[in-house]
């Protein structure tokens, strides 16, 4: 009776998924030990390393230079007064102040005068005439208002300014004469402008007051003679022949009251020697209808129409 009620035994295959048998565990361990190892088993993090590494064929980036640190001036612990640097001091000086400084330095140290002369740029005709024009403007503004502008009273008011202008004229004129000035055209242009300024000096009722202007005319006439003779030696005097200087000098002589007649005579003799002076228009090329004049002026053939023959 008990044998009939006893529970039948459970087959062994029902326990395969519940508990491993010792024989299966040992065989499983042995099979895993005999299995060939792969590279992934030795270095499990190699996959992460390869993923984080950059491709071998990617372009190499140039290293960026590190920005240089700016040199920041540290504030002085103790601030005190000090003189300006020379560069800042010169920036505050105007033309008159700078000229005064240079003049005083050259007076105290004469050896600096030569250095300043060689260092300063050579004055041009326009700059020299501008200086003379400034003296003339100062002279004109010094005349008394109203009254006779040629009286002795007016002369005494502007006498010093006349002296300053004539002194500057006497200093600039030799600078533009040969051999110091190698370009004849530059010398002629200066004399033309300087003579115009000299014409504008006033004439006074007292003849004695006009002596300074008359002496200045004599000096400027000598300067014209020097330049005219030098121009005749260069290029066959082409500048005198076709520059119109005979007409300009004749006009200056007429304005000066004949005080430049000596320069006119030298110019006439130079043009006659060169065979180019016929009348007052010789420097312009002679007869406007001549072929020579048309060739020099570039008008040859412009007055005559082009004739076309019939076919």
Curated annotation (Swiss-Prot):
GO molecular function terms attached to this record: proteasome binding
Biological process annotations from GO: nuclear protein quality control by the ubiquitin-proteasome system; proteasome localization; protein transport
Disulfide bridge map: none
Gene3D superfamilies: Tethering factor for nuclear proteasome Cut8/Sts1
Keyword line: Cytoplasm, Nucleus, Protein transport, Transport
Cellular component, GO, one term: nuclear membrane
Low complexity bias locations: 52-70
Cellular localization per UniProt: Cytoplasm; Nucleus
Domain of life the protein comes from: Eukaryota
Region feature (Disordered): 24-84
Ranges of Basic and acidic residues composition bias in the record: 38-50
Entry-linked InterPro entries: Cut8/Sts1_fam (IPR013868), Cut8/Sts1_sf (IPR038422)
Subcellular location, principal: cytoplasm
Described function: Involved in ubiquitin-mediated protein degradation. Regulatory factor in the ubiquitin/proteasome pathway that controls the turnover of proteasome substrates. Targets proteasomes to the nucleus and facilitates the degradation of nuclear proteins.
Quaternary structure and interacting proteins, as annotated: Binds the proteasome.
Family: Belongs to the cut8/STS1 family.
Name under which the protein is recorded: Tethering factor for nuclear proteasome STS1
Originating organism: Paracoccidioides lutzii (strain ATCC MYA-826 / Pb01)
Gene label: STS1
């Amino acid at each position: 009776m008990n044998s009939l009620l006893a529970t039948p035994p459970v087959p062994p295959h029902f326990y395969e998924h519940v508990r491993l048998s010792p024989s299966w565990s040992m065989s499983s361990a042995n099979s895993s030990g005999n299995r060939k190892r792969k590279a992934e088993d030795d270095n499990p993090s190699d996959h992460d390393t390869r993923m984080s590494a950059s491709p071998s064929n990617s372009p190499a980036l140039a290293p960026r230079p590190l920005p240089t640190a700016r040199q920041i001036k540290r504030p002085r612990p103790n601030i005190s007064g000090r003189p300006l640097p020379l560069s800042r001091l010169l920036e505050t000086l105007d033309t008159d102040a700078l000229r005064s400084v240079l003049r005083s330095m050259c007076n105290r140290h004469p050896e600096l005068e030569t250095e300043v002369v060689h260092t300063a740029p050579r004055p041009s005709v326009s700059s020299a005439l501008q200086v003379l024009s400034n003296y003339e403007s100062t002279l004109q503004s010094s005349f008394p208002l109203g009254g006779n502008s040629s009286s002795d009273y007016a002369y005494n008011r502007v006498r010093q300014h006349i002296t300053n202008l004539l002194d500057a004229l006497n200093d600039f004129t030799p600078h533009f004469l040969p051999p110091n000035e190698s370009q004849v055209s530059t010398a002629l242009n200066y004399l033309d402008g300087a003579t115009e300024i000299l014409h504008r000096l006033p004439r006074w009722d007292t003849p004695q007051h006009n002596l300074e202007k008359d002496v200045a005319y004599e000096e400027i006439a000598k300067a014209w003679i020097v330049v005219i003779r030098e121009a005749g030696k260069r290029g066959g005097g082409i500048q005198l022949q076709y520059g119109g200087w005979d007409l300009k000098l004749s006009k200056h002589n007429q304005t000066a009251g004949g005080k430049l007649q000596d320069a006119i005579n030298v110019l006439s003799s130079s043009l006659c020697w060169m065979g180019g002076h016929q009348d007052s228009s010789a420097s312009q090329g002679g007869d406007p209808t001549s072929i020579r004049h048309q060739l020099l002026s570039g008008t040859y053939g412009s007055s005559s129409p082009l004739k076309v023959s019939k076919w």
